[in-house]
Amino acid sequence: MGELFRSEEMTLAQLFLQSEAAYCCVSELGELGKVQFRDLNPDVNVFQRKFVNEVRRCEEMDRKLRFVEKEVKKANISILDTGENPEVPFPRDIIDLEANFEKIEIELKEINTNQEALKRNFLELTELKFILRKTQQFFDEMADPDLLEESSTLLEPSEMGRGAPLRLGFVAGVINRERIPTFERMLWRVCRGNVFLRQAQIENPLEDPVTGDSVHKSVFIIFFQGDQLKNRVKKICEGFRASLYPCPETPQERKEMATGVNTRIEDLQMVLNQTEDHRQRVLQAAAKSLRVWFIKVRKMKAIYHTLNLCNIDVTQKCLIAEVWCPVADLDSIQFALRRGTEHSGSTVPSILNRMQTNQTPPTYNKTNKFTYGFQNLVDAYGIGSYREINPAPYTIITFPFLFAVMFGDFGHGILMTLFAVWMVVRESRILSQKIDNELFSMMFSGRYIILLMGLFSTYTGLIYNDCFSKALNLFGSSWSVRPMFTDTWSEDLLKHTSVLQLNPNVTGVFNGPYPFGIDPIWSLATNKLTFLNSFKMKMSVILGIIHMIFGVALSVLNHIYFKKPLNIYLSFIPEMIFMTTLFGYLVILIIYKWCAYDVSTSMVAPSLLIHFINMFLFSYQDTSLPMLYKGQMGLQCFLVVCAIICVPWMLVLKPLILRRQYLRRKHLGTHNFGGIRVGNGPTEEDAEIIQHDQLSMHSDEEEEFDFGDTVVHQAIHTIEYCLGCISNTASYLRLWALSLAHAQLSEVLWTMVMHIGLNIRSLGGGIALVFIFSAFATLTIAILLIMEGLSAFLHALRLHWVEFRNKFYMGTGFKFLPFSFETIWEGKFDD
């Protein structure tokens, strides 16, 4: 049947790795990515395992690299990514790597420390420069006679009368601009208005030496009288984290200090530039090798983590590991082990030994870039049980098709297809860019799903003859109104009737079915919705029942593969009979009615709903209701009886037969004596010698039969299946409902937006149409493509997860997670 339709055959293998070759062998297995290691030390603490020191050393190197990476990104230097997959370094190379990383880290920390000190000094000098400049302006203003009255308010009137010469003290400093209002109010309240504050903003933002952020600050100068106020002012400045600087009192001293400060700033700026150039050179050199270093260190860390899962034999010369691996890849695994042994220089080969086990292997489905997205849709609901039918190959067709039934629009399908084609054509470039946007990454990983959804939507849009809510007249309508004017429509009828009906029984009115899809004339009909609703509702029922019957049919493939004939006779056959006799018969009735009744006999066509209800009620007394075909009553009674028989068939027989088999095995049971199993069977050849570990393994995992649990389980399954056939069939009506909703939304959008623009007859209509079309395009993409597309996607997903897969899919397995370096060299370090 092909491995595409089932998960890969897996085996449990035991690896015997020589201590000196274990590192290289695990490295080769990581490059291969085909084995899943089992933890053989589940009871051993992580910090007590053999290679914990090596793991810690790798984590320390990883920490240093993250520090370097942070500094590189802070400097806006791009990390070189050539796509190279470097080889794993040997254990002896870890010392050189540690020394190299230690050197880079120490050098960067020294540079950062020196640079921070220089920047702090530069900030202080810059603030002092602005203080000297602004305070000079303050003192110049204070020397203005017009300001004398304002400045004298600090003096008591009695002191002014005595004319005593008083000296005002002052402090100058710099504070964050946003703290000025609070700072000013605090000074006023604490000093009770006995201080004079002047402040001016520094136009250029200053750089914080610690964070590197730009900070807006202001210069202030505070005048006061007395030591008590001076102490209060300094405490307030300290509380608001204001920086105070000494400011000379005379203009000459301030000028000399400003000259010295400017000279020191120029010298400091030169040193800062040289320091930054040196830092840039160090970071640029590190950025060239940073990705390679990350990959090497994290590969080493992954190897040592894996080695900690292994057991060590009593001689301390060999490591024992257990791995799950695909049977088809055993040769490549053997070759990888030989290659690792050769690289290590060991003369003793590593051994791979297949083991017999009753444990359920992990599920491994091989995928490529096309099937990857569809397999993820399957696995999102539940990982398939080992070797059961994989729904992904069928989902490749059925999922986009059911989506398109709900989304069918030729125009919208074309837009979706173009978007998917763009992603497919540019996939190599997009992959190389490593885009971090989660939403786009999710859509890109499902690009082939979107492509098929767009193609199928284009097809169903042609079937519905719907393109942005408008019909396409590709072949010309098969309906003609001309013959109706000859005899049927009178002048009086035309004058007094607003809605006219075309009679297909009149010769020449209807010339046969439209070549492909729905006739475009229906887009003009007032009973368009009535016709489309009937068509889409029946189509949804037909597609849904066929989909479910296909799911039931797939279950027999599982029963055959797992050699469970009891499930074929007691589950598959009654389930198929129940489904086909009731709902398969309904599909046949729908198709039969389409074929048996034409335009001439449509007036006497019976209602399928009434016939289907009467079928379950065995009600055939109403002679006014014509039969669909001869012998209908007998056939329908037979089908209902067959369906009723299937219920006890599924409910009762299987538990009874399982109980009988259990009692028979118990009567012919076996007993273990040491390493020998002796049976009470009809022949003495049934005794076989079995290894003790195999006996204990089998006996531990052998399940005890419980008749009560079996009856309850079978009752639940039977009730769920019988009721599910009804509810699941009704659930497929969502195909009709969402298709109708999509068509109506598309029509409303055209009528309310685009139609208005096309009806503008003035000269400005062309200009207005540009803006109206922009709004129409935006709403089409946002509402009809994204929102409606997501809605149809989720409904199609539900139909596959519930209505389709519950017929055959167990989904109780666990995923095969091989030890692989792929996620590391692809840049997904956190994985």
UniProtKB/Swiss-Prot annotation:
InterPro entries attached to this UniProt entry: V-ATPase_116kDa_su, V-type_ATPase_116kDa_su_euka
GO BP annotations, alphabetical order: vacuolar acidification
Vacuolar side: 408-409, 472-534, 594-638, 744-764
Localisation: Cytoplasmic vesicle, Clathrin-coated vesicle membrane; Cytoplasmic vesicle, Secretory vesicle, Synaptic vesicle membrane; Melanosome
Protein name per its UniProtKB record: V-type proton ATPase 116 kDa subunit a1
Topological type in the membrane: Multi-pass membrane protein
A GO term from the CC aspect: melanosome
Quaternary structure and interacting proteins, as annotated: V-ATPase is a heteromultimeric enzyme made up of two complexes: the ATP-hydrolytic V1 complex and the proton translocation V0 complex. The V1 complex consists of three catalytic AB heterodimers that form a heterohexamer, three peripheral stalks each consisting of EG heterodimers, one central rotor including subunits D and F, and the regulatory subunits C and H. The proton translocation complex V0 consists of the proton transport subunit a, a ring of proteolipid subunits c9c'', rotary subunit d, subunits e and f, and two accessory subunits.
TM stretches of this protein: 389-407, 410-426, 442-471, 535-554, 573-593, 639-658, 719-743, 765-803
Cross-referenced PANTHER family: V-TYPE PROTON ATPASE 116 KDA SUBUNIT A 1, VACUOLAR PROTON ATPASES
Keywords from the UniProt entry: Cytoplasmic vesicle, Hydrogen ion transport, Ion transport, Membrane, Synapse, Transmembrane, Transmembrane helix, Transport
Lineage, top ranks: Eukaryota, Metazoa, Chordata, Craniata, Vertebrata
Pfam families xrefs: V_ATPase_I
Residues in the Cytoplasmic compartment per record: 1-388, 427-441, 555-572, 659-718, 804-831
Entry keyword Transferase: no
UniProt record similarity statement: Belongs to the V-ATPase 116 kDa subunit family.
GO molecular function: ATPase binding; proton-transporting ATPase activity, rotational mechanism
Protein function: Subunit of the V0 complex of vacuolar(H+)-ATPase (V-ATPase), a multisubunit enzyme composed of a peripheral complex (V1) that hydrolyzes ATP and a membrane integral complex (V0) that translocates protons. V-ATPase is responsible for acidifying and maintaining the pH of intracellular compartments and in some cell types, is targeted to the plasma membrane, where it is responsible for acidifying the extracellular environment. Required for assembly and activity of the vacuolar ATPase.
